[in-house]
Amino acid sequence: MTETPNTSSEEIQTSEPSPDNELQVLQQENANLKAELQEQNDRYLMALAEAENSRKRLQKERTEMMQYAVENTLMDFLPPIESMEKALGFASQASEEVKNWAIGFQMILQQFKQIFEEKGVVEYSSKGELFNPYLHEAVEIEETTTIPEETILEEFTKGYKIGDRPIRVAKVKVAKLPAKGNSDSNEEKE
C-alpha cells in the first residue's frame, strides 16, 4: 500500500489548524488567562482587605483592653482617695501639728486628682440635679412636696466618668412625691 500524494496533503491540511482557528484558540486562551488573573487579583484584594480589617479590629481590642485596665486601676484608688478627703475635712478641728500634716496630705491628694484628670477621669456633681439612672444609683428615697420629684437631695458617694461614660455611678438620695394613698390615710388619722 502506497500513499498517494493527494492523501497525504489532505491529512496535513486537516491536522494543521487554519490561521483563523488558531487566532480564535489564542484569543480564547487569552480571555481565560485574563479571567483567571482577575479572579486571582480579586482574591488578593479580598485577603488584603481581610488582613487590614483584622489589624484594625485587633488594634481596637488592644486599645479597649488598655483603657479597661487603666479604668480598673483608677477605680481601685477611689476609696482611699475619698477616705483621705473625709479625714482632711476634720483637719480644721485638730491641733496645729495635725493641720501641718493635713497640708502635706492635701498636696498628695491633689497629685492623685491631677493623675485622674490626665487620664480623663472627672468627678461629677449630682446634688440638685435630676435623677439619671445612667449616672446615679438611688440608695434612698425621701418623700417630699417641697422639692420636684426625682431631684437628688443628697450624694452619698461621688460619681466619676471618662468622657460621657460613667466608670462609677453616684449613690444618691432622691426626692419623691408622697403617694396619694399615704396623704389621705395621714389626714384620716388626725
From Swiss-Prot:
InterPro entries: GrpE, GrpE_coiled_coil, GrpE_head. Residues 1-18 have a biased composition (Polar residues). It holds the Pfam family GrpE. The keyword Metal-binding does not apply. GO terms for cellular component: cytoplasm. It is found in: Cytoplasm. Its main location: cytoplasm. GO terms for biological process: protein folding. GO terms for molecular function: adenyl-nucleotide exchange factor activity; protein homodimerization activity; protein-folding chaperone binding; unfolded protein binding. SUPFAM superfamilies: Coiled-coil domain of nucleotide exchange factor GrpE, Head domain of nucleotide exchange factor GrpE. Keywords: Chaperone, Cytoplasm, Stress response. It comes from the Bacteria. The keyword Cytoplasm applies. Participates actively in the response to hyperosmotic and heat shock by preventing the aggregation of stress-denatured proteins, in association with DnaK and GrpE. It is the nucleotide exchange factor for DnaK and may function as a thermosensor. Unfolded proteins bind initially to DnaJ; upon interaction with the DnaJ-bound protein, DnaK hydrolyzes its bound ATP, resulting in the formation of a stable complex. GrpE releases ADP from DnaK; ATP binding to DnaK triggers the release of the substrate protein, thus completing the reaction cycle. Homodimer. Belongs to the GrpE family. This is Protein GrpE. It comes from Chlamydia trachomatis serovar A (strain ATCC VR-571B / DSM 19440 / HAR-13).
